[in-house]
């Protein structure tokens, strides 16, 4: 299932979210959805968190940054998680 580097990051994120008891949904980017929405929409301990998963030194697109900025502007938290900072996610959710 986790064949690409980004898919491996997503698998690790899912595992952490499940371990921490967080609610999450993964919107599917289809013709009927909104492009640029974070990979994970999370509710943990009453807080809304948008998580964009990236592999290696992958950069967010302008559209993804726009969505992350809108989440922050609405009082939520927006994170970009990759292999280098994935351990910080568990600490953040604690």
What residues fall within each predicted segment?
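Catalytic phosphate/metal-binding cores of nucleic-acid and nucleotide-processing enzymes, i.e., regions
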Residues: 1-94
